Amino acid sequence: MAKIVDIKGREVLDSRGNPTVEADVLLDNGIIGSACAPSGASTGSREALELRDGDKSRYMGKGVLKAVANINGPIRDLLLGKDPVDQKALDHAMIELDGTENKASLGANAILAVSLAAAKAAAQDQDLPLYAHIANLNGTPGVYSMPVPMMNIINGGEHADNNIDIQEFMIQPVGAKSFAEGLRWGTEIFHHLKAVLKARGLNTAVGDEGGFAPNLASNKEALDAIAEAVANAGYTLGTDVTLALDCAASEFYKNGKYKLSEEGEYSSAEFAEYLAELTRKHPIISIEDGLDESDWDGWKILTDKIGEKTQLVGDDLFVTNTKILKEGIDKKIANSILIKFNQIGTLTETLEAIQMAKAAGYTAIISHRSGETEDSTIADLAVGTSAGQIKTGSLCRSDRVSKYNQLLRIEEQLGSKAVYRGRAEFRG
């Protein structure tokens, strides 16, 4: 049995040019597992704490040397000599050492980087692909499925410097026969969308997640542009390809009202109806954070209104936290959870959230953050848990494409065992 003999933390840069944490876990047989913590832009108020230095003389206060010091000091001391394969013991030891509800002492970014690096080292030690090791940790050994990609091809909200309120307009290649085919479809649509926007005299610069970030007159205009791109690419909207939204509604919820820059002001019930009307007019099969994270009454209205046929995803609402998710399940709020490692801070707690969601009949979507690195762990997480869906941005920027490329490798490795369920992963 291999043992951990060293742990090293360092400050590296994410895709937005901000510092983040990378950790190496070294084993006594020479194996090294490395992982980076991602960082979000639109964040839920109840997420685990991302520890930043606050020193304005370095990186405008966004440095992570405190988190790195916690890795190189107390976390290293705690885990030396431990078995890397026992993920639960490692994660619980770090949680106990931190001693806070939201990992504010050591920093969720420090704990997560070590948690994921240990999992990578353990996978190598057992001569397993990371997704296979994750499946073992998940209690589903040998069970894998390829996720349907939810491709964010128009960026708005906090992910872009434009006037679109809704943060993400996504496409899903639900009619494809494999992940590789679905990725090709999405890429072709992405390039056709660029041509559509150019023909309209619109900007084709991209946002944080690689989607285009044009100034459009309304959210409807974004949907219309995507519909034109899908048709121009030779696919049928509603059968080959469907749509999804991430409203990130907490970002435009002010004083009890939802305020859209071009389309007016709405109460909770009115905005729920606004979203319902969008699903009637467009083949939108998934809506994320359609209402504010604190507007549970509004969420209940939306769930009762369209939850039977539409996937309603809690991101800021649930923040990958089993306590909050259980409350949502009990109250029949939403029907899906977005899974982000760094919202909770360990691999073990991430797996627990996925397991709780699935047991309750909720879907679980594995997700990146807007501040990413070349680390592709979420691709292995999606396959190893058979989550069925993944959000990892658009079809450009290497911080996004690295995850897609890892999924291509995994599908090739699995061969005939690779299952891609397409539309069956969604409601309705």
Swiss-Prot record:
GO terms for molecular function: magnesium ion binding; phosphopyruvate hydratase activity. It comes from the Bacteria. SMART domains: Enolase_C, Enolase_N. GO terms for biological process: glycolytic process. Its main location: cytoplasm. It is an enzyme of class 4 (lyase). It is found in: Cytoplasm; Secreted; Cell surface. Component of the RNA degradosome, a multiprotein complex involved in RNA processing and mRNA degradation. This is Enolase 1. The lineage of its organism: Bacteria, Pseudomonadati, Pseudomonadota, Gammaproteobacteria, Pseudomonadales. The gene is eno1.
